């Protein structure tokens, strides 16, 4: 279900300055064929104050993006309130409960994974989250690099996604990154 991509979100503080980034690869796979190598699966929302990315069915993900963006607008960009209301709406709607997609949403203060079942998961360290077929590779690499390498945030996201792209057949190294 969640094959064909890797999305990595990373937030924190460096030199007393907050940062938030999201990155993703560009591969789209249909069965055992790569049909696109440069897709964009990340975007900024609410006047560039929130970042998001998706893994899973593209059509389902765009439905989730639209719904989340509408709720985020109604909550005036409050990410925490938006993910809670998003989860409530998702669970109420029988159609949404069948969508095969996951999202990461983050800002300078929070990072969340929105699961295909309507769950809201805050990243364990409130710093790094990853989804998709290469998500565990990217998450492991990002945690190690964050702990030991002391890289600039953009470089950490890029290198973590490259590692995932080298290991996961559904992920490539055509990486796109957005930052707040």
UniProtKB/Swiss-Prot annotation:
Documented activity regulation: Allosterically activated by HslU binding.
Enzyme Commission number(s) from the entry: 3.4.25.2
Active site (catalytic residues): 5
Annotated GO MF terms: metal ion binding; threonine-type endopeptidase activity
Chain positions recorded as Na(+) binding sites: 165, 168, 171
Location(s), subcellular: Cytoplasm
GO cellular component labels: cytoplasm; HslUV protease complex; proteasome core complex
Main localization of the protein described in the UniProt heading: cytoplasm
GO biological process, one term: proteolysis involved in protein catabolic process
Catalytic activity: ATP-dependent cleavage of peptide bonds with broad specificity
Keyword set, alphabetical order: Allosteric enzyme, Cytoplasm, Hydrolase, Metal-binding, Protease, Sodium, Threonine protease
Physiological role: Protease subunit of a proteasome-like degradation complex believed to be a general protein degrading machinery.
Protein family: Belongs to the peptidase T1B family. HslV subfamily.
Subunit annotation: A double ring-shaped homohexamer of HslV is capped on each side by a ring-shaped HslU homohexamer. The assembly of the HslU/HslV complex is dependent on binding of ATP.
The protein, known as: ATP-dependent protease subunit HslV
